[in-house]
Structures are given as C-alpha cells and as structure tokens.
C-alpha cells in the first residue's frame, strides 16, 4: 500500500509502481469472497518512514473483510507491533529489525509468540535486503533462521527481490532448498508468481 492505494512495485523500485483501481478494503473483501483465509499487506509508506502509516486503513480492512491479515512495513518498535495488533492485524511481518537487531526480534518472538511474529526475509543474490530493499546486508537468510529458531520462529516469508513484481516465476530452487533444510518452519513464497502453473509447482 502506498498513500492508501493498492500498488505493485517491480523489484522493489518505488519509482516503478503499478497502481490498481480497487481500494485495499475492497480488495480484501474480494479475496475473502473467493475463500482466501489470510492476506499479506505491506505498508510501503511505513517501510520508507520506519513507522506504520496506514493504521486506519488496516482497521477498515480488518473490520470489512473476514480474513486474517499479516501486516508489514515500518515495524521497528514494540509500540508499532502493539499498534498493528490493536488495529486488527493477526500477524506481524518484521524484516529490517530482525536482520539488523537480532536480539530485539528474538525478544519480540518470546513476547508475542512465534505464531504471530513472521520473519520477513527478503533476499537479493543470496543476501538479505532491508529498509524497503534499499540496502543489502552481508547476511544470508539461513543465518537468520538459525539464529531465531531457538526463540520460537515458525513462520518465514521469503521474497526473491530479483523476481518480485516481474510475474515470470519464482525462485523454485531457493524455496525448495529452504523447505528441505528447515522442515519445521512454514515458508511463504513471495515474488515472481505469475500463473496457476507457478502456484501448482
């Protein structure tokens, strides 16, 4: 979401955005009507500014559609986490803080529980990217998972940035390797899915 509207970025580039006509609330309702149980929402304004910016919109989505909402973007404090949960989010996706302040995210895992806290690990060329994909770290997703598992990590959303928004297929090899290595972690594949064949595979 940017400025209250549904958008799709190409490879995380804010300058390359496609804006969709449907409002986020209407989109959430449409997904719910199709039987979707859980939707993924990123507050891109929040990701850029380091604090949630679309809380009222989150509240309207939570009230207006009978789906679980996983919410990310700008979640860098305990107060921000409590705010999105208060406004209706079921799950919190934390990426930048988890990668850059690992002890803090470990505390949040223990505080809120691994069933609500989701590690958002966005990768580019094998390394984790943070701060709205504007900065790449010398850190792998495997290193992050290994660190957080003892604290209750059970859910990971992994996006291959080079595939994101391109609609040309995800990084099957990356996700297959991660799932086989960490069988007790639930992975959500993100980035590049452009067809039913991609989903089935």
Give each language-model segment a name.
Residues 6-52:
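N-terminal beta-alpha supersecondary unit
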Residues 62-91, 173-201:
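Catalytic cores of alpha/beta
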Residues 20-32, 76-82, 136-147, 199:
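Short, acidic/polar
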Residues 3-16, 85, 89-164:
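Conserved anion-binding
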Residues 1, 39-41, 67-73, 92-94, ...:
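Hydrophobic faces of well-ordered beta-strands that scaffold small-molecule active sites
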Residues 52-59, 134-143, 168-176:
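Charged helix-capping and loop-helix junction motifs
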Residues 29, 59, 82-85, 106, ...:
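Alpha-helical segments flanking ligand/cofactor-binding loops in enzyme cores
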Residues 38-57, 96, 158-168:
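Glycine-rich, proline-tolerant flexible connector loops at the mouths of alpha/beta enzymes
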């Amino acid at each position: 979401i940017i400025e209250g509207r549904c958008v799709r970025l190409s490879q995380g580039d804010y300058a390359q955005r496609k804006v969709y006509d449907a409002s986020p609330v209407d989109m959430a309702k449409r997904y719910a009507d199709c039987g979707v149980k859980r939707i993924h929402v990123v507050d891109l304004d929040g990701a850029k500014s380091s604090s949630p910016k679309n809380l009222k919109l989150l509240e309207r989505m939570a009230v207006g559609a009978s789906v679980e909402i996983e919410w990310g973007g700008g979640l860098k404090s305990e107060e921000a986490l409590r705010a999105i949960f208060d406004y209706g989010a079921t799950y919190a996706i934390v990426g930048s803080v988890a990668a850059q302040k690992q002890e803090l995210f470990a505390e949040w895992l223990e505080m809120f529980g691994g069933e609500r806290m989701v590690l958002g690990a966005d990768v580019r060329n094998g390394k984790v990217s943070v701060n709205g994909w504007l900065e790449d770290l010398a850190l792998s997703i495997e290193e992050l998972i290994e660190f957080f598992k003892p604290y209750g990590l059970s859910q990971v959303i992994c996006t291959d940035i080079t595939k994101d928004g391109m609609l040309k297929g995800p990084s099957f090899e990356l996700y297959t390797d991660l799932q086989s290595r960490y069988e007790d972690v639930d992975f959500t594949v993100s980035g590049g899915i452009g067809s039913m064949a991609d989903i089935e595979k």
